[in-house]
Amino acid sequence: MTKIIFMGTPDFSTTVLEMLIAEHDVIAVVTQPDRPVGRKRVMTPPPVKKVAMKYDLPVYQPEKLSGSEELEQLLQLDVDLIVTAAFGQLLPESLLALPKLGAINVHASLLPKYRGGAPIHQAIIDGEQETGITIMYMVKKLDAGNIISQQAIKIEENDNVGTMHDKLSVLGADLLKETLPSIIEGTNESVPQDDTQATFASNIRREDERISWNKPGRQVFNQIRGLSPWPVAYTTMDDTNLKIYDAELVETNKINEPGTIIETTKKAIIVATNDNEAVAIKDMQLAGKKRMLAANYLSGAQNTLVGKKLI
């Protein structure tokens, strides 16, 4: 069986790891260190570590791989292939050169578009109608190696980061399973990326999460979809942060300053943008409160909201 080092961290990576465990000999798993999670800051292992522990696989968790003791240990292994999927660190050249068959990455975009750490978020924020999975060889430069295989998938109007993450996670494992035999046999072909067409999807920053209502409704809607259910787009109402998990677009002829609540229905809070498409907030969370449907919030506040300004 092919001896593989797997490197990944979040839920996206777990379906790939499960497939590799079923089909090949995973001799080591490299992931990020345990991190404090939640209000109580409980030290929590990354999802990939949980899978690895279930199968009693050796786990390495370097804070930074380059120059680490873990790297020195990995370099002693007899390995055929390195597979990464959302690992979260660049690999040092010494590790890239280790496996006989090279190092490959499962990336959640149609490269060369959306290189970087947040390709699913950015594709939805940008209003793309499709995205996909790329299997490519790894090089020192971020997400720039030769493409081995690709498969596209449609982004539906009601998709958000959560739904696309789940679809792409499965697609990534399936495409890798189809692609690996030719890599192992040495019969695969690969195509260089066109660097002139490269775009980048940097990790989401806090400032990317705040909604600017002075934009077309479609852009605001895509931002909400592209940040839900994590890290979640937010606005401010009555000096209180308001996270928006779900919304829809509605046509309106009411002319109001962007950010103004122009109407409430039984199920939504409707907010003006800078064009004739308003945003209907359907699922929300006020700071310090539990997440709730707008319908539940409106049962006690419907008559007091119209005319308020979100900023």
UniProtKB/Swiss-Prot annotation:
InterPro entries: Fmt (IPR005794), Formyl_trans_C (IPR005793), Formyl_trans_C_sf (IPR037022), Formyl_transf_N (IPR002376), Formyl_transf_N_sf (IPR036477), Formyl_transferase-like_C_sf (IPR011034), GART_AS (IPR001555), Met-tRNA-FMT_C (IPR044135). GO terms for cellular component: cytosol. GO terms for molecular function: methionyl-tRNA formyltransferase activity. (6S)-5,6,7,8-tetrahydrofolate binds at S109, L110, L111, P112. The gene is fmt. Belongs to the Fmt family. It catalyses: L-methionyl-tRNA(fMet) + (6R)-10-formyltetrahydrofolate = N-formyl-L-methionyl-tRNA(fMet) + (6S)-5,6,7,8-tetrahydrofolate + H(+). This is Methionyl-tRNA formyltransferase. Keywords: Protein biosynthesis, Transferase. Its EC number is 2.1.2.9. Attaches a formyl group to the free amino group of methionyl-tRNA(fMet). The formyl group appears to play a dual role in the initiator identity of N-formylmethionyl-tRNA by promoting its recognition by IF2 and preventing the misappropriation of this tRNA by the elongation apparatus.
